[in-house]
Amino acid sequence: MKALYERWTAISLPKRILGGMIIGAVLGMVIPQAVGISILGNLFVNALKGIAPLLVFFLVISSLCQAKQSHGGIIRTVICLYLFNTLLGAVIAVVASKLFPITLTLAQAAEETSAPQGIAEVLQTLLLNVVKNPITSIAEANYIGILAWAVLFGVAMRGASARTKEIIDNFAAALSKVVTWIINFAPFGILGLVFDTVSTNGLQVFTEYGRLLAVLVGSMLFIYFVTNPILVYWCIRQNPFPLIFKCLKRSAVTAFFTRSSAANIPINMEVCEEMGLDKNTYSVTIPLGATINMNGAAVTITVMTLAAANTLGIPVDIPTAIILSVLSALSACGASGVAGGSLLLIPLACSLFGISSDVAMQVIGVGFIIGVVQDSVETALNSSCDLLLSAAAQFREWRKEGREITY
């Protein structure tokens, strides 16, 4: 059994995941009635979601209680990159929507859903999540609360004994080991997720609402393959594409099928460790990115809102488009704190144009129809950019120190 496991782990993870994708797609088309296969995907996603809050909590405490002051500069750089990238996503979505205007067929109202009524409500939700009970935050995977309490505990424990710090560090290492075991079975999880998608939706979702999907996905691909390389080059001053493709293979592919930035946090941390990045930095920036680095969500909110405006014949001038970009970026940063994510923040952006809640809910309904593709690509972009920008900021510091950048 041990020999079989060693042979399995000897094959590179991307190759194993690719094999799982192919087998899952074939099984989904050949035997779609074998619904039991999809449980592999559910087990994988739930295992990652289960371990991620504990991993983040103890890694952040371990990192901060032993951290040196020099790490603050890197973290500030990463946060600036996150916020700029999210705003850039909204701007690109505005340009794409202007070049390829979309209208929607809104035949019937979507099911009534509770959505935020204004930016104040989004900010209030974020602030309340910060001070939520730490045990509740871990149980509910409230990463804003987890980060806030972990930072407080980590700073408070800087004066603790070396033995206490060692115990915390050992516990964090044990959690990281468990994550490694889970990730080794990612191909089976991806197999189940792909099977579920293909057997349930087939290829139909790629043909309906094709123009809308093309603008959404096209904008996200433009961000990943055009603007991201520019940002990375600014940081590392060398060819950015090896790092771009590494993050694509190791982070985006998994996030595409799990459709969960939270579930992808352990995977991103694993890749950071492989690249030799500073754990004191990435243990903070990766979970933080899952909350505020939301360029994919900004694209979705902007494109869907402008599609609603076009459908109703509402003209959108340049100043309004700029305001929409900022509003979408701010809303996107709150997407992780709202059940339903970016789609349920569409009414907030629609309010800028005086679009009624009924119409906004119909737009959300369209979003749920294309969600199997839109949400997958959005999550892949969001989560892989957490890894990409965290690495780029770290490599920027290495470049300044004259260290060789290898990944």
Where are these regions (language model features)?
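Juxtamembrane helix-boundary/capping and inter-helix hinge elements in multi-pass membrane proteins
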Residues: 64-73, 159-163, 200-201, 237-240, ...
